[in-house]
Design a protein with these regions (language model features):
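Short cysteine-rich clusters marking metal-coordination/redox-active sites
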Residues: 167, 185-188
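Short, intrinsically disordered, charge-biased short linear motifs at domain edges
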Residues: 151-158, 166-178
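Short, non-ligating residues that shape and space the ligands of small metal-coordination modules
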Residues: 175-176, 193-197
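Internal alpha/beta core interface subdomains
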Residues: 135-138, 144
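Loop-to-transmembrane alpha-helix entry segments
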Residues: 147-148
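Cys/His-enriched microdomains
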Residues: 162-165, 183
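Basic/polar N-terminal segments that are highly enriched at the extreme N-terminus
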Residues: 1-4, 196-198
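Flexible, glycine/small-residue-enriched loop-and-beta-strand segment within the central core
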Residues: 2-11, 16-19, 26-132, 164, ...
Length: 198
């Protein structure tokens, strides 16, 4: 690892000189950070992570190995992104136009995706384009997220469906008989649903 103004970059990582990396962040082996990407302070960007052009990542974000964050993705502070998570950004993916010509940037419309603060995305989950994942939401491993996920919502499956709520401490709070969880978190004692809005 090399030290550049308190940013650690592994020698095999490829970081564009046009990217902005916050202090205390680490970029691990074989990661690629493209032009105009912005990574906040105290982040961990794991092995073989791809951070596309103009992607924005907040402070204290953990991006585990083999994650792909494509153009149009914004990740707020304190988010956990598990191994092999893939963000998509094109609702109508095609390599060529109907006339057979190769698609260019002019033929393509990026869908924006937002992951709000404190959310957690389990390993191997896929996030379809144009999705917002709410604050402190939790996406189970292997899920395919096809719709917005509310604050504190726990979802899993293909397509991802509501299973309950997620406490900021990480404790899953399962719905009972189709009703959202109400009460105290058994791990940290927080009241649910939260008494103050996010």
């Amino acid at each position: 690892m090399t030290e550049r103004t308190s940013v650690r970059v592994h020698p095999t990582a490829e970081v564009s000189p046009d990217a902005v990396i916050g202090p205390g962040s680490s970029i691990w082996n074989q990661a690629q950070v493209r032009e105009r990407a912005r990574i906040g302070a105290d982040c961990i960007i794991g092995k073989n992570v791809y951070v596309d052009t103009d992607v924005v990542i907040g402070d204290r974000v953990k991006v585990q190995n083999n994650v792909s964050l494509f153009h149009g993705v914004t990740v707020e502070d304190g988010v956990f992104i598990g191994p092999h998570v893939c963000f998509t950004n094109d609702r109508v993916p095609r390599a060529v136009n109907p006339d057979g010509s190769i698609k260019t940037d002019d033929d393509w419309e990026v869908s924006l995706t937002l992951v709000r603060h404190g959310a957690a995305l389990g390993a191997n989950s896929t996030i379809l384009p144009g999705i917002t994942i709410g604050p402190w939401a939790m996406v189970g491993s292997g899920s395919v997220v096809t719709r917005d996920v509310d604050a504190h919502e726990l979802v899993a499956g293909n397509p991802a469906r509501r299973l309950g709520s997620a406490c900021p401490c990480g404790q899953p709070l399962r719905d009972a008989d189709g009703e959202p969880f109400h009460g105290r978190c058994p791990r940290c004692g927080a009241t649910f649903p939260p008494e103050t809005p996010e």
